[in-house]
Amino acid sequence: NPVALAAGIETMKILKKENPYPRLAKFAKKIADAMNSKSEKKSQKVHCVNEGGMFTIFFTDKKPLRNSDDIKCCDTAKFAEFFRKMLKKGYYLPPSQFETAFISAVHTEKSIEKFIMDAWL
């Protein structure tokens, strides 16, 4: 499809020119750091991990999470409750705690701050 090919080429040009990846990683780290900090202060069983522009929120007191066995012990019912709460607030997160959320190039410092405030349990 020539239209899809043209769109892909233009997308690659924009990504090369603007290089949003460091900003995406900074935002994902900001979310993880905020969630983990608040979790520790409130003694909540929440652990957020990030890599690049991705993050995942786990409901567990096990830290660090090193493998799939650690992750399987997380509270999926609590995550489902969190997912529904965030969906009502207009955030579409992955519906499973075994998937990751992605920061996009359209997210701003303000939208990340709002997410952190809205996400706090």
Question: How would you label these PLM feature ranges?
Answer:
Residues N1-L121:
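Conserved N-terminal phosphate-binding loop of PLP-dependent enzymes in the Aspartate aminotransferase
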